[in-house]
Amino acid sequence: MAAEILEVADLPARVGPRQRLIGIDLGTKTIGLALSDVERRIATPLETIQRIKFSKDAVRLIELAEKFDAGALIIGLPLNMDGSQGPRVQATRAFVRSLSALVSKPFVYWDERLSTAAVTRSLIDQDVSRLKRAEVVDKMAAAYILQGVLDRLRRIEADAV
């Protein structure tokens, strides 16, 4: 099964009215996850998966998608600063292709440039220790990515009125 990739504007028509969204910050060593509320207004950091191998990572992701009745998966697309696509984008797309063979949920890519940097800056401003930052930065970056999509959905709804 090929990955079904949607645009943000397509989500309201394709996702149930109270289905949550899961945000994903895919890294080489970890996968940060975030969850929306059922009204799709607020993103909350959920957990960080320590990457072991794809099959184990996918099992946990699918468990959470089913547990929280997620309607779609929002995955950060790590574009280069100039907007070009490098090796990390290709790795992300390969991950989505592999995951789509196991899950029937649609995916939305969201530009994640500087998301981890923004979260790290915010944590430093809050005087969070380096050790604690390392524990939470990935799931907070996933929440940052997901919140971007939720905010965009709100703008789309406002424009439709």
Curated annotation (Swiss-Prot):
Gene Ontology CC entries for this record: cytosol
Lipid biosynthesis listed as a keyword: no
This protein's record includes keyword Mitochondrion: no
UniProt keywords, alphabetically: Cytoplasm, Hydrolase, Nuclease, Ribosome biogenesis
UniProt-listed GO biological process terms: rRNA 5'-end processing
Localization (cell): Cytoplasm
Recorded GO MF terms: nuclease activity
EC id: 3.1.-.-
SMART domains (alphabetical): YqgFc (SM00732)
Main location: cytoplasm
Superkingdom, taxonomy of origin: Bacteria
Similarity field: Belongs to the YqgF nuclease family.
Main function: Could be a nuclease involved in processing of the 5'-end of pre-16S rRNA.
PANTHER family, A to Z: POLYNUCLEOTIDYL TRANSFERASE, RIBONUCLEASE H-LIKE SUPERFAMILY PROTEIN
Name of the protein in question: Putative pre-16S rRNA nuclease
UniProt organism field: Methylocella silvestris (strain DSM 15510 / CIP 108128 / LMG 27833 / NCIMB 13906 / BL2)
